[in-house]
């Protein structure tokens, strides 16, 4: 709600304060949790291909959520309420809420991309080549963040995720 306001009008002090508070809350939550596969791949993309971490997270999050879906269905389903609101949550059958959460994130990401020009695929970054996927996957497998991912991932599965977010 506030991010578009700040992008459109950087002088909107109320929206900027709301964004600062959101950043503080996110940082606090992040500091008290482990990360997982999305960060392991993101760290590798940064190291191997020099993709900014925030861009990598934006590109990877929906695909990695899809990868983890069977292990995280209930938790993902709970996120639908704050993301989409009570009407959408109530209208979505419980067994479909997790996928609806991912779909909602993809739609929100596209709105943000339309507003800011943020890339939504690896090819749009201009920094990644498909020939680098093997090295990125190997690097991600050696990242400590991968240990806490709900679903184990191997080299081929990580390469598959990279292919999925390529174009």
Model regions: which residues?
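Active-site segments that bind and position negatively charged phosphate/pyrophosphate groups
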Residues: 1-107
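Mobile late-domain/C-terminal helix-loop "cap" segments
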Residues: 62-167
């Amino acid at each position: 709600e506030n991010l578009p306001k700040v992008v459109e009008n950087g002088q909107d002090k109320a929206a900027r304060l709301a964004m600062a508070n959101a950043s503080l809350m996110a940082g606090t939550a992040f500091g008290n949790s482990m990360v997982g596969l999305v960060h392991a791949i993101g760290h590798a993309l940064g190291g191997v291909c020099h993709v900014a971490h925030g861009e990598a997270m934006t590109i990877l999050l929906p695909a990695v959520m899809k990868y983890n879906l069977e292990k995280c269905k209930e938790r993902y389903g709970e996120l639908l309420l704050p993301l989409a609101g009570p009407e959408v949550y109530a209208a979505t059958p419980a067994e479909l809420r997790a996928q609806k959460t991912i779909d909602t994130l993809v739609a929100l990401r596209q709105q943000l991309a339309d507003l800011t020009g943020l890339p939504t695929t690896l090819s749009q970054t201009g920094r990644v080549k498909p020939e680098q996927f093997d090295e990125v996957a190997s690097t991600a497998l050696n990242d400590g963040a991968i240990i806490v991912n709900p679903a184990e991932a191997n080299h081929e599965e990580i390469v598959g995720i990279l292919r999925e977010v390529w174009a």
